[in-house]
Amino acid sequence: VPRGGAAIDRVGVAVQTGVAASTARLMLHAPLTNGLPGALLFDWGTVSTATGGDKEITISATLPAGLVLLTCVVSAAVTLYGFESYGTGIFGNSSQAGSEGSPYRDNGSMTAPNPWGTTGISYSADRTARLAVRAA
């Protein structure tokens, strides 16, 4: 996020395969020194992930300047579209030739974790979930 922050009016997630009656909670976390999510900055609420497609929430927020992490918690085993992480070390690869994607962990509930926590961290096979914000 640029110096001075950035005003946004939408936050969303791209769902590939939904699960009936499921939802995703969309949030923003500050990073820990190791790059994993830390303190909760925003909890924007939930969107339905019962069907595929781009799901968004209309919001009014100003993101703080610097590195921040868009995060989500899903209520079921939905399939999210993602960015392939091969050759993009910033998204969790151990090297430019690595094949690990973004970090995740079983939250055990739909609550907004604050802080995110570092126990039980796993890494997706090869992709980073496609979460997005829109400038106001």
Protein language model regions, located:
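A short beta-strand element within beta-rich, extracytoplasmic domains
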Residues: 6-17, 70
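Short amphipathic alpha-helical surface micro-motifs
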Residues: 7-10, 52-54, 111-116
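Aromatic- and Gly/Pro-enriched, solvent-exposed loop/edge beta-strand patches characteristic
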Residues: 20-99
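Short, surface-exposed beta-strand/loop patches at domain edges
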Residues: 73-136
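Short, proline-centered helix/strand-breaking motifs
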Residues: 1-5
